[in-house]
Amino acid sequence: IFLSFRLAMSTEAPGQFPRIRMRRTRRTPALRRLVVETGLSASDLIYPVFVLDGDKRTEQVASMPGVERQSIDLLLGTLGEAVDLGIPAVALFPVIDADKKSLDGAECANPDGLVQRTVKAIKEAHPDLAVITDVALDPYTTHGQDGIIDDAGYVMNDETVAMLTRQALSHAEAGADVVAPSDMMDGRIGAIRNALEAA
């Protein structure tokens, strides 16, 4: 009866009061669930986390109250809570020690690097959790740019794309489910896709 009533309302007088009274469809939780346009639950979420090297380390993120960076060992416990809540995916953002940064950000593709070790640890501890990795050079460069720069400080697009491709491949080899480029280099999506397909 309810469904046919709604269909009749929509064909007889679309958008005209008093025939259309949306309050009718909002009066009980069950009716609201039937007509809801968008539903959002824990299974729709991706949990962003900041990981740092070391053991039993945490650091508060001053600009984001209540958010902290964690070492891998502590992060695994936090992710266990996320899994228990029904959150299906995690997005990793590394905090790289200064001594591992360089002009070209080559540490990003280290198979034993922070992100790569984190991906492996997560997949071992929580195999059903989807792992998304950030493909970007800014955490790894001494200058903080998201690309390899020349002597004049100009970002070299193609050289950067080559490094980002190496990074994405190393993440995939470590077990990442999704590699997510966040840089702004021209052509990097195609280059990464081609390299992943060829691997």
Regions found by a protein language model. Give the residues of each.
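Short, Lys/Arg-enriched N-terminal segments with co-localized hydrophobic residues
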Residues: 1-8
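N-terminal amphipathic alpha-helix/helix-capping segment at the start of soluble metabolic enzymes
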Residues: 10-57
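Alpha/beta enzyme core
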Residues: 53-199
